């Protein structure tokens, strides 16, 4: 299994309970597809470098995990259809 890092930004006007549920849901998507989560780092609300979908701020979440491409592909597929996630990106951790 390779190491990966996923960073995603949640829209800032979502309720805190819904935000927590969203983070748990996407963590579960990874683990259900065979990934082992090492660390979930919630960076909090930050200003975006540029406006995305009329939002100037966003709630940043970074997940470090070990897993396969299938886990990333499923995360990517579901994140694209979720209106609460305004941007996401996955990279391979070379460490």
From Swiss-Prot:
Keywords: Ribonucleoprotein, Ribosomal protein, RNA-binding, rRNA-binding
Any GO BP: translation
Domain of life: Bacteria
InterPro entries attached to this UniProt entry: Ribosomal_bS6, Ribosomal_bS6_CS, Ribosomal_bS6_sf, Ribosomal_S6_plastid/chlpt, Transl_elong_EF1B/ribsomal_bS6
Recorded GO MF terms: small ribosomal subunit rRNA binding; structural constituent of ribosome
Database matches in Gene3D superfamilies: 3.30.70.60
One GO term describing the cellular component: cytoplasm
Function: Binds together with bS18 to 16S ribosomal RNA.
NCBIfam families from the UniProt entry: S6
Family: Belongs to the bacterial ribosomal protein bS6 family.
Protein name: Small ribosomal subunit protein bS6
């Amino acid at each position: 299994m390779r190491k990966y890092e996923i960073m995603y930004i949640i829209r800032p006007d979502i309720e805190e309970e819904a935000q927590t549920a969203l983070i748990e849901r996407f963590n579960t998507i990874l683990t259900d597809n065979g990934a082992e989560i090492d660390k979930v780092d919630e960076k909090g609300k930050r200003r975006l470098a540029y406006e995305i979908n009329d939002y100037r701020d966003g709630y940043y979440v970074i997940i470090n995990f070990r897993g396969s491409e299938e886990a990333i592909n499923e995360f990517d597929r579901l994140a694209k259809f979720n209106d609460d996630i305004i941007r996401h990106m996955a990279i391979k951790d070379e460490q």
